């Protein structure tokens, strides 16, 4: 299990290195097109067939798109993450989720929430 986490982390690091560096103000257009990007402490990337937007890393996913549905983290941590949410909102309907459920969706999909998987 530890090796898998290490490989995933290394793979994500390489994907982020290839993603275009953008300003946060332009991030929404990347989110709407579901394209990878790297902003200032703001990331958008594909993982396991899901498009994930994170603020300050994997512990705080803002938005996740899976199978035609957008999920939105409704928890607030800082003014900056709230600003990131505003800058990246896809301007489509979203289903509100807790941060814990968003991490489960990010790693296992919505089915992980349905079966009660832990973070």
PLM regions and their residue ranges:
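Terminal leader/tail segments of proteins
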Residues: 1-119
